[in-house]
C-alpha cells in the first residue's frame, strides 16, 4: 500500500470520526485490494477489540489507520453475511456490519419521479422501513437532505451519538443506511451536519410514528401489518358520487371531547396499564382517551346522533396542544397522544363498520419553526422559501412551503395519498386555503412579493392544489376534498381540467357570517336585516358549498353558539334550534362542531372537555334530541340533499316578509319529484293564521317542528298538518293557513293520500 493511499486512509478515517464523511461505503465494508485480496473495514467507535466472523472462523481485526477503523484481510469477497464480535466497555456482542449492505434503496426511477414531483408513493422509499437486505432483517433509513455535509442516524441504538451510524449520500441528495437486526419501536432522529459546521437533530419528515409530546423523536414503525375489514365500504365509496349523498359532519377535537381519570388507565392487551397522557396542566388528574377508547365511546355516540361523517381536527403529529394540531411536525404519523398508528387504523375500521366516514383536517399551507421539524432542515431553506416575504407567516409564527420545488410538492401530494392509502380516510378538509392562494395574505404593503405577473395570486400554490386534487381523485374517486377558503376565489370546486382548483366541496364562510350576524341580533332588529338569511341563495350554486359552524366560531371570546343568541334562556335555546334547522334545510352539506349538538355553554377550550353534564338539563337534552331527529329527517328525505348543487333543488315561496322575519321555501329532488315546504319564523311573536302559498292542493303533514315540546319548545304547531285552501298567494293558487310558533322552523310534506284524521290517529297511537 503506497504512502498516498495510507494518507488517504488516515484522512478518511479522521473524517469519519469528525462526522464529515458523506460516502462511508468508499472506506468501510468489504473492499477489494489491488492484489486481488479483500479487506473488511468496520467502523466501531470506542471499541476495545473487534473480530471478524466469517465462515465459522474468527479473524482479529487491526486498527492501522485509526483507533475506530478495524480491518482484517480475507481471500474472497465476504459478501454481507459476516458478523463482527465487538468488545466495548468490557461487554461483548455480535452484530452484522451495516456497511456490508450496499444495495441502493432508492432506485433510478424513484429518484426521477421524486425529482419531478410525481412519486405518489414516495413514503414507501423515504423514512425508516423494516425490510430484508440479502436475507437479513433490519431497518432501511432514507432521507432527502441535498444541502447537508453529512447525515447520521442517531437514537437509542447508539446512545444518540452521530459518530456511530453515518449515512451514505446517493444521487439527488438522498441519504441511505441499512441497520441490520434493528427492530420496531426504536427511537431515532437524523443528525444533520451542515456545510457551515452547524449540527441539527431532526425528526424524520417521513416518520410513521413519533414520541408523545413533549418528546420529539421518531419511532421505527411498520406500514402494512394491519388487517382491514372495510373492503365493502371502500368499494362502495369509490363507486358513488359523494355530492349525491346526505353528508352531515360532526367536527371534533379528539383530545377535548371527553377526558378520563389518570387513576383509571387504559389496559393493554397483555393486561399492563398504559402510562397516561396528561390532558392538560390546568386539569390535574385528567388523561386523554386512547384511540381504542374513543372507538368504544365516540363511534356509538356519533352513530346514535345520526351523523354521516366525523371530521377530526388535525391528528398528524404536533408538539403543541395549543396549536389545536394545525402546526404539524409529523406529516406521516397520527399523533401518539392517543395511541399507535395501528390503533388509529382500527378506529377508522370501526367507523366504517358502523357506516361512518372519516374526514381529517390537512394543513399543507404552513409549518412551525420547531427545531426538530422541517424548518432550515439541512442547513438551508429546503422546505420553505428563503425570502420571508413569501416564506413566512409572521402573524402565525410559521413558515410557508416552497410549492415551486418539485420535491417539496411531492412530499405534500404523496402525504395526501398516504392518508387515504394507509389509514383509509374518506376525506380531507384543507385548512386556510386563502392563506395559500394570496401572497399578501395578512401582510401589509411592502412585506409581500408579487408573482411573476406582478399580481398577488400565489400561482405556485394554485398549481400545487390542482395537482393534489387531481392525484387524489385519480387514486380515490369517491373521496371528499373540502376547502376552507374564505374569499371569493373563483372555481374552487370546479375540476382542474376546467381550470378550477379541483376540490369537490367548499365551506360557505359567507353563509356562516351572515347567519351568525343575523341570529345575534335582537329579533326586533332582524326585520332590517332580512338579506342576511336570504342572500346566500343568490350565490349558492356558484360552488359546491358545505355549510359549516366550526370550531373557529366558538373560541377567542366569540362565545359558544348558544350564548351568541339574544334574549332569555328560552329564547337562546329556541334561536339555536331554529338556526340549526335552517342550516339542515338550506342547500349544501352540513358540518357542526362538537358541543353544538346539545347547546354547550362554555367556549371551546383545547385543554378542557365538553360540558356533558348539561345533558341532565332538559333544554340541552331537547337540543340534543332535535339534532338527532334532524339528522334522521335529513337522511330520509332526499329533497334535502339530492339536488344540493342544482337550482332545481330549491325554490323560494316568499323571502320578502321582513316585517315578520318569516321566510318560506321548497326543497325538491329530481329523481322521484318529492318536495318539502319549509317555513321559519325568526321572531318571538307567534302567528295563528299565517298564509303560505303551495303549488299543489292536498294535505301537508307537519313532519318537523323545532318548537315541539320534546325539543324544549312551547309545543305550538299545526296538530300534525294542514289541508290546503284555495286561497292564492305567493304566485300559487293554493295555500296553507298555518300556526307559526315563536323562533321556529317547520317542515311540511305534501301527501294527497293522507288526511288530518289519519295523521292525528297516528300521533295518538
UniProtKB/Swiss-Prot annotation:
Catalytic machinery residues: 431 (nucleophile), 484 (proton donor)
EC number of the protein: 2.4.1.18
Keywords: Carbohydrate metabolism, Glycogen biosynthesis, Glycogen metabolism, Glycosyltransferase, Transferase
Subunit structure: Monomer.
The UniProt record lists the keyword Glycosyltransferase: yes
Gene Ontology MF terms: 1,4-alpha-glucan branching enzyme activity; cation binding; hydrolase activity, hydrolyzing O-glycosyl compounds
Family annotation (InterPro entries): A-amylase/branching_C, Branching_enzy, GlgB, GlgB_N, GlgB_N_E_set_prok, Glyco_hydro_13_cat_dom, Glyco_hydro_13_N, Glyco_hydro_b
SUPFAM superfamilies for the chain: (Trans)glycosidases (SSF51445), E set domains (SSF81296), Glycosyl hydrolase domain (SSF51011)
Pfam short name (any one): Alpha-amylase_C
Pathway of action: Glycan biosynthesis; glycogen biosynthesis
NCBIfam families membership: branching_enzym, PRK05402.1, PRK12313.1
Keyword Nucleotide-binding: no
Entries under HAMAP family matching the protein: GlgB (MF_00685)
This protein's name: 1,4-alpha-glucan branching enzyme GlgB
GO biological process per UniProt: glycogen biosynthetic process
Similarity comment text for this entry: Belongs to the glycosyl hydrolase 13 family. GlgB subfamily.
Catalytic activity: Transfers a segment of a (1->4)-alpha-D-glucan chain to a primary hydroxy group in a similar glucan chain
GO cellular component terms listed in the entry, alphabetical order: cytosol
